[in-house]
Curated annotation (Swiss-Prot):
Cell wall formation. Catalyzes the addition of glutamate to the nucleotide precursor UDP-N-acetylmuramoyl-L-alanine (UMA). PANTHER family: UDP-N-ACETYLMURAMOYLALANINE--D-GLUTAMATE LIGASE. Belongs to the MurCDEF family. Its EC number is 6.3.2.9. This is UDP-N-acetylmuramoylalanine--D-glutamate ligase. Keywords: ATP-binding, Cell cycle, Cell division, Cell shape, Cell wall biogenesis/degradation, Cytoplasm, Ligase, Nucleotide-binding, Peptidoglycan synthesis. It catalyses: UDP-N-acetyl-alpha-D-muramoyl-L-alanine + D-glutamate + ATP = UDP-N-acetyl-alpha-D-muramoyl-L-alanyl-D-glutamate + ADP + phosphate + H(+). ATP binds at residues 119-125. Pathway: Cell wall biogenesis; peptidoglycan biosynthesis. Coiled coil: none annotated.
């Protein structure tokens, strides 16, 4: 961690805990700040607040008292999940108190260079691939950010010889100021989080902030398969490298089934361990970032031919009596399920789908389901999905949840079939998180092996 004194004796409010808020509070406390933490969860149920109190940090829990901001704070570190129209945030901004997120703090304390990855889909897989490749190459890469490892906590421990490989959400990027990654990567840009940002333009503007402090000495990696991303190349001061499955570009690309970086042959596209065009894009993006950090081809090939996927993200679980089973519980929207389906032969595929009903239809999914062998539906959207399947003459069965769906569909399947959980819906009708949904599916798989 850098030896910085700017926070010493400064009164700082950390708004919202969870892991990132707790990490920020501990880092700031170590840097000599006078830290106050405010979180809405009652103290008795708030493990993070209890730990911080033991560290001598002032904690205020159970509500967000607006008069707390009368204490003349020099800075607010906001949990990224808290919206900017929150009364506490609005009051802080009215008082000219700077509001940042924890990734800005991570940048300020980090001695290590940062690879920042953002975008709508593919962030976690691409982030993990990059870190795995660099580590396979003998380098020291540290996963951090929106991937489950608080950025400031990892940055605090990182050395100058490490590389921070940081997954970044639009929520996190809205709260940066001086944040400047050495390499930034935008996987793609689609419609998402409009309930938070208010518009697609605001969402994309938040993502675009990843490069706002970069110079020509830094690198921005863009997806030239997407025209929207291609047009961004002229709007940055950073040096742009691209990836594409459709044409030769300045970074990584595919030509006649072969993957190249610039003019250098890397490997056959067919050797990739993960199925689907979207995972080919993820692999190309990871190759560009890894090559920019000096990774050798051997490390790239080793990882890309053996990578089993990130948990709950088109994760290959194994076989049950000759049937392959995949867990894609992270597919919480139609687009994610469309991308998953693109990697399989529909004629041998059974799709397990359903979940929270957000009021939308599934018409956009119909073309992707042509010739599907069968479906199992569950959750609030079960009836909508069943009607769609019947319209397309797809055999369809209803089940209570993901665990029963797998058990009940097995007698309908044949050797050589593939079973894919890719719900196309959020999990909150039956589960707290998509992780819980996926874990129960994994448990069902293990019980049937």
């Amino acid at each position: 961690m850098k030896k910085i004194t700017k926070f010493k004796d400064q009164k700082i409010l950390v708004l919202g805990l969870a892991r990132s808020g707790m990490a920020a509070a501990l880092v700031l406390n170590e840097l000599g700040a006078i830290v106050t933490v405010n979180d809405g969860k009652p103290f008795e149920e708030n493990k993070e607040a209890q730990v911080l109190l033991e560290e001598g940090i002032k904690v205020i829990t159970g509500s967000h008292p607006i008069d707390l901001l009368d204490e003349d704070f020099a800075l607010m570190v906001k949990n990224p999940g808290i919206r900017y129209d929150n009364p506490m945030v609005e009051r802080a901004e009215a008082l000219k108190i700077p509001v940042i997120t924890e990734v800005e703090l991570a940048y300020l304390v980090s001695e290590a260079p940062i690879i920042g990855i953002t975008g709508t889909n593919g962030k976690t897989t691409t982030t993990t691939l990059i870190a795995d490749i660099l580590n396979a190459d003998g380098q020291s890469a540290k996963l951090s950010g929106n991937i489950g490892f608080p950025a400031s906590e990892v940055a605090q421990k990182a050395q100058a010889t490490d590389t921070l490989v940081m997954e970044l959400s639009s929520f996190q990027l809205m709260g940066i100021d001086t944040f400047r990654p050495k390499i930034a990567l935008i996987t793609n840009l689609f419609s998402a989080h409009l309930d938070y940002h208010g518009s697609q333009e605001a969402y994309e503007a938040a993502k675009w902030r990843i490069q706002e402090n970069m110079t020509a000495d830094d690198f921005l990696i863009l997806n030239f398969n997407q025209e929207k991303c291609r047009k961004l190349a002229d709007k940055t001061k950073a040096t742009v490298l691209a990836f594409s499955t459709k044409e030769k570009v300045s970074g990584a690309y595919v030509n006649e089934g072969k993957i190249y970086f610039k003019d250098e042959f890397i490997m056959e596209a067919s050797e990739l361990s993960l199925p689907g065009d979207h995972n080919l894009e993820n692999a190309l993006a990871a190759i560009v970032a890894s090559k920019l950090r000096g990774a050798e081809n051997e490390a790239i090939i080793e990882v890309l031919t053996s990578f089993a996927g990130v948990k709950h993200r088109l994760q290959y679980l194994g076989e049950i009596d000759g049937r392959k089973v995949y867990n894609d519980s992270k597919a919480t929207n139609i687009l994610a399920t469309q991308k998953a389906l693109s990697g399989f032969d529909n004629s041998k595929l059974w799709l397990l789908a359903g979940g929270l009903d957000r009021g939308n239809g599934f018409e956009d999914l119909e073309k992707d389901l042509e010739d599907l062998k069968g479906m199992v539906v569950f959750g609030q959207t079960a009836d909508k999905l069943r009607l769609m399947a019947e319209k397309l003459n797809i055999p369809v069965f209803a089940s209570q949840n993901v665990a029963t769906a797998l058990k009940e569909i097995m007698p309908q399947t044949q050797v050589g079939d593939t079973i894919l959980l890719s719900p196309a819906c959020a999990s909150w009708d039956q589960y707290k998180t998509f992780e819980e949904r996926g874990d129960l599916f994994i448990e069902a798989f293990e019980s049937l092996k």
